[in-house]
UniProtKB/Swiss-Prot annotation:
Pfam families on file: Arm-DNA-bind_3, Phage_integrase
Domain named Core-binding (CB): residues: 102-180
Protein task: Integrase is necessary for integration of the phage into the host genome by site-specific recombination. In conjunction with excisionase, integrase is also necessary for excision of the prophage from the host genome.
E.C. designation(s): 2.7.7.-, 3.1.-.-
Domain of life of the source: Viruses
Keyword terms: DNA integration, DNA recombination, DNA-binding, Hydrolase, Transferase, Viral genome integration, Virus entry into host cell
This protein's name: Integrase
SUPFAM superfamilies for this protein: DNA breaking-rejoining enzymes
Length: 402
């Protein structure tokens, strides 16, 4: 039986779940209909013509879908028809898109693989580590396109460190922006949300070790910690290099007869080939260390596999803890390995080292016009001022640096 009055909520509520002798069809307008089965089940369907043939397309079930929602869906079907599209095909495509929609983890990994790894970014392991720690579990199996800003605010608010919350928002925002541009997710749920809305930037560090601090560090290294940790800290004390550069270093990076070492392009954030000088003490430090190890990497984990040391670099948090162990053990004020770079740069400046040489010693790229036209690495100047720094250190510790 078919009636042609408009569909109303009152009619449908009265008919819902009540048995009847015949199936009833209630027509609304512009092709929308409600079907009431003999068992009292109500469903919406849409009638239209395609290629000269009558078509009936399911819209949804009442009351899970309201009348308003059914009418909105009907309007979508009509719009598709106006555009020359068959609603049946569009419904299939919509369903496929929902089924293939990326989860938060899938979208993040897509960015890692298609952007970070493809472009040689070196902090990939760290990105994955912090994502697993702070985002993966609360957003487990959740589709990106199903998330809203409020969901993300709750996740970021649950991160204990406000600095890390600030960092994670920036990181995820970058990842999702890339995915939107590649059309693998529909929109960026973090668009418009500022890092300052959920956290704060890390405070600018000003820690500089004084002579007494440097003396304590050197004396502590004489009788504490593993050979890897002692080597890494001493090498940074002599060169001012980034922790990651020596942590990831391999035998082939060193040209000890020339008092040089090279950080290959792609091995750290600058992604350019960097040649650095070495003082005599640094050369001897490396030579002595190479005699003690049988791995390609100079700073490896102590974990043994099949009776041998695993030939892979120690992870960043492990290296960072080397400094913590020292200031905890000596009772010094807190400092980080990165503070050692600031200490060396400041001391060298006070000793008269030109700023451009300090920049090269630190592995920084030139800025402005010099970045484009001056590619000189001042290697002889680097070696000279590293010898000056070695002599200054030896005056502080009161003995040859070894």
């Amino acid at each position: 039986m078919c009636t042609h009055s408009m569909i109303t909520d009152t009619k449908l509520r009265k008919a819902l779940g009540k048995k009847r002798d015949d199936i009833e069809i209630i027509s609304d307008s512009h092709g929308l209909n409600a079907r009431i089965s003999q068992a009292g089940k109500i469903s919406f369907f849409y009638r239209y013509r395609w290629a000269g043939k009558a078509v009936k397309l399911n819209v949804g079930d009442y009351p899970a879908m309201s009348i308003t929602q059914a009418r909105e869906r009907r309007q979508q079907f009509r719009n598709w028809l106006t555009e020359g599209l068959d609603p049946r095909e569009q419904v299939k495509l919509d369903k496929q898109t929902r089924q293939e929609a990326m989860s938060v983890a899938e979208a993040f990994n897509y960015w890692i693989e298609r952007h970070c790894i493809a472009n040689g970014l070196v902090k990939v392991d760290y990105y994955r580590q912090v994502f697993e720690k702070h985002i993966a579990e609360p957003m487990k199996n959740v589709k990106v396109d199903n998330t809203a800003k409020m969901h993300w605010i709750n996740v970021f608010d649950s991160i204990e460190s406000r600095v890390m919350a600030h960092y994670m928002l920036s990181l995820c925002k970058r990842a999702f922006r890339f995915c939107v541009n590649r059309s693998v997710i529909a929109s960026n749920p973090l668009e418009g949300l500022l890092p300052s809305d959920v956290g704060q930037k890390p405070k600018k560090r000003t820690r500089r070790m004084d002579d007494d601090d440097l003396r304590k560090i050197y004396q502590w290294l004489k009788s504490h910690m593993s050979i890897e940790s002692v080597f890494l800290v001493k090498f940074i004390m002599l060169t001012g290099c980034r922790t990651a550069e020596i942590r990831l270093s391999e035998r082939s990076w060193f040209r000890l007869d020339d008092n040089e070492w090279v950080v290959p392009a792609g091995s750290y954030k600058t992604r350019v080939h960097i040649r650095r000088g070495l003082s005599d003490a640094a050369v001897n430090l490396v030579r002595n260390h190479l005699k003690k190890i049988n791995t390609n990497h100079l700073v490896t984990s102590q974990r043994k596999i099949d009776g041998g040391i695993k030939d892979s670099p120690v992870h960043s948090p492990v290296a960072s803890n080397y400094a913590r162990s020292i200031w905890n053990g000596t009772g010094m004020a807190e400092w980080s390995l990165h503070d050692m770079r600031r200490t060396i740069a400041t001391n060298l400046s006070e000793l008269g080292c030109p700023p451009h040489v300090i920049e090269k010693l630190l592995g920084h790229q030139m800025v402005g016009v010099m970045a484009h036209y001056n590619l000189h690495d001042y290697i002889d100047d680097q070696k000279h001022w590293l010898r000056v720094w070695q002599s200054h250190l030896e005056e502080i510790i009161g003995e040859p640096f070894s």
